[in-house]
């Protein structure tokens, strides 16, 4: 199986079109536009502030807290050491990369590797990470904002962490996985967390971490646990939030979905027909207030979808006001995260400005 470490090693090679994954595919086979956008970004001669809502980071101190556990497999069959190494915060290196990619501001997040850890240790890790994120944002407020980490396996603790992160540390919401140890976010145990996010008027950034039950099916060449599994995990998470009535219960809850929301935007119309096709599979006690596809207006979708055509399709499905810029930095999925947006002939300059930063600025309550 291709590991993330092996995949990451291809980043520089991929930029020049070298074969990766042993698949015989080339980065150039689905080439990004040749124009490379760098700071400052101008649209119609006007300076535009770009805000990247999908930017990973890690702190070495979290590994210290983990101790020997850092070598154990914690996320999607990968250890903390393997996942974290490429994302350790090196400010000068990160700022230089942001300048090259045309990113004014990153909204930093840490993919949750602690859901399977006992409450006290997980709480220590989350506390440390939120403190470090707040320090980094305070040091470079014009370049960094952040989503808090939450001990979501202990919802009562997560509520306290979110309150502290937003009200005292200035963080802009929270980053969560696609499931918590196999439990869907629609489970009532998580309702207090969603209620707190709604009260604080901050978004939750859903980023998948891997579905253990699919690991065997997706093993082998091609990094399928991520390439296919991650979008699927997001699709499942969002679908449960819709069909179990969570969005009805929390109508002001704001969710940002990584990787363009997985497969949901393309299959939302199929969801609209699901209960018509199989009425017995739908709970008569859960009466949704809207058709399933209408809930896409409560979800924001990042732009980590690679091509101008994919952007056109996403905007057509969910509306331009629901799409925000993402890069997946430092992982080399999309080496030039602005190019496919600029190359999209279907987008007006005003729409591009929205996607690049204006929508995120409103969502996160700061000025673009």
Feature locations, PLM:
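Alpha-helical scaffold segments that form or flank carboxylate-/histidine-based iron centers
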Residues: 51, 150-153, 157, 256
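Divalent metal-dependent hydrolysis catalytic cores, especially in the metallo-beta-lactamase
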Residues: 77-87, 93-118, 143-151, 172-176
């Amino acid at each position: 199986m291709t590991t993330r470490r092996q995949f990451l090693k291809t980043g520089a090679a991929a930029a020049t079109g070298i074969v990766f994954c042993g698949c015989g595919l080339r980065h150039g086979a689905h080439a990004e536009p040749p124009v490379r956008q760098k700071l400052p970004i101008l649209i119609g001669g006007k300076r535009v502030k770009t805000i990247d809502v999908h930017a990973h980071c890690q702190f070495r101190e979290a590994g210290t807290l983990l101790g020997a556990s850092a070598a154990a497999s914690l996320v999607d069959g990968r250890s903390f050491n393997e996942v974290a190494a490429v994302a350790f915060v090196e400010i000068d290196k990160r700022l230089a990369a942001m300048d090259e990619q045309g990113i004014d501001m990153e909204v930093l997040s840490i993919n949750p590797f602690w859901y399977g850890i006992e409450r006290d240790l997980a709480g220590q890790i989350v506390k440390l990470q939120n403190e470090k994120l707040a320090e980094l944002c305070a040091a470079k407020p014009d370049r960094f904002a952040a989503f808090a980490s939450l001990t979501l396996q202990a919802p009562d603790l997560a509520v306290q962490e979110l309150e502290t992160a937003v009200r005292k540390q200035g963080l802009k919401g929270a980053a969560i996985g696609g499931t918590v140890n196999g439990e869907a976010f629609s489970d009532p145990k998580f309702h207090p967390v969603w209620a707190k996010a709604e009260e604080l008027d901050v978004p939750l950034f859903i980023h998948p971490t891997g579905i253990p039950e699919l690991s065997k099916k997706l093993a082998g060449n091609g990094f399928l646990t991520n390439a296919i599994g991650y979008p699927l995990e997001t699709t499942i998470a969002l679908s449960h939030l819709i069909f179990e009535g969570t969005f009805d219960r929390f109508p002001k809850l704001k969710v940002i979905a990584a990787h363009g929301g997985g497969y949901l935007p393309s299959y939302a119309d199929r969801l609209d027909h699901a209960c018509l096709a199989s009425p017995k599979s739908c709970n008569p006690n859960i009466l949704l207030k809207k058709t399933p596809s209408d809930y896409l207006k409560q979800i924001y979708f990042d732009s980590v979808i690679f091509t101008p055509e994919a952007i056109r399709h996403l905007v057509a499905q969910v509306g331009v006001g629901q799409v925000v810029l993402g890069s997946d930095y430092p992982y080399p999925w999309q080496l030039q995260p602005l190019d496919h947006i600029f190359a999209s002939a279907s987008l007006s300059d005003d729409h591009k400005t929205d996607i690049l930063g204006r929508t995120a600025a409103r969502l996160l309550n700061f000025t673009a």
